[in-house]
């Protein structure tokens, strides 16, 4: 048997940025496909529009900065950022929402700080928060899951809705489910019902919760979980941040549910609602804006999990992940400063 010989140093080859971004994007596709299946063509339209704007914006900035355009665009980082923005906003949001958000993410959050590897905030989440604060109506107008829609939207109707060829009166028809109730995310629905004095049990009796978690959202989270596990298998991401988030969110929500089940949703609902699995595996694990040491990553993830629970339970934004991740991004340098990896040659007890 012939063996391949190589001279020292025998170093493990790290994945290049292009390969990492491509693998993350491919692993996110099951989640995107699930969103498309349950919520229609708008998901794909928003993603494709975001990718187009991201590439054009990055090319324009690179030209102004006199940096190589083709080689930089080929690292796929702009595509991944655009994908995350596209799946995070309502599928029938006006076209200019995703355009403004994508330009903000690429030009301001990414390149204003020096480009890839220099940004202190996650670009996709910074853009999402900016859009949510600036355009709350458009960012909370979610479409009805196709299985609950009074009038499902095909591709033509979706394009008309996104690009402004549909009157607000006609568009409102597609925002109502078969029970006549305007749709929101399951977390939004629970939050609103609790503010009206309903119990969790009463809220979960609505049509949107016919599968126990929120029609469509459970399987979307399962799809992103599958993609996340694939990334762990491929060693694209480290496990500490994801485990830290899930553990902290599970523990906090379990205590809340045990203390007051009428006003606190259970841990499984927390884990499989909203953008939980998308954020846990595809957003919070961004190595540029996260802590770097093993213990630091666990603390970073735990901080996000606690913040998500607190904001979801007591704050005004039910999903909470975008705010939690940005706050954790602020804390990452502090975590790295005080929690450093052990250096080689360290003697136990010294």
UniProtKB/Swiss-Prot annotation:
Q: Which cofactor does it need?
A: FMN
**Where does the UniProt annotation locate this protein?**
Cell inner membrane
Show the stretches that span the lipid bilayer: 36-56, 68-88, 89-109, 120-140, 212-232, 239-259, 265-285, 291-311, 315-335
Pfam families under this entry?
A: NQR2_RnfD_RnfE
Set out the biological process GO terms recorded for this chain's protein.
Answer: electron transport chain; transmembrane transport
What EC identifiers does the entry list?
7.-.-.-
PTM sites of type FMN phosphoryl threonine: 185
Q: Which UniProt keywords apply?
A: Cell inner membrane, Cell membrane, Electron transport, Flavoprotein, FMN, Membrane, Phosphoprotein, Translocase, Transmembrane, Transmembrane helix, Transport
Membrane topology recorded in Swiss-Prot or TrEMBL? Multi-pass membrane protein
Q: What main location does UniProt list?
A: membrane
Family the UniProt entry places it in: Belongs to the NqrB/RnfD family.
Q: How does it assemble?
A: The complex is composed of six subunits: RnfA, RnfB, RnfC, RnfD, RnfE and RnfG.
Q: What is this protein called?
A: Ion-translocating oxidoreductase complex subunit D
Species of origin: Shewanella piezotolerans (strain WP3 / JCM 13877)
Gene name, please?
Answer: rnfD
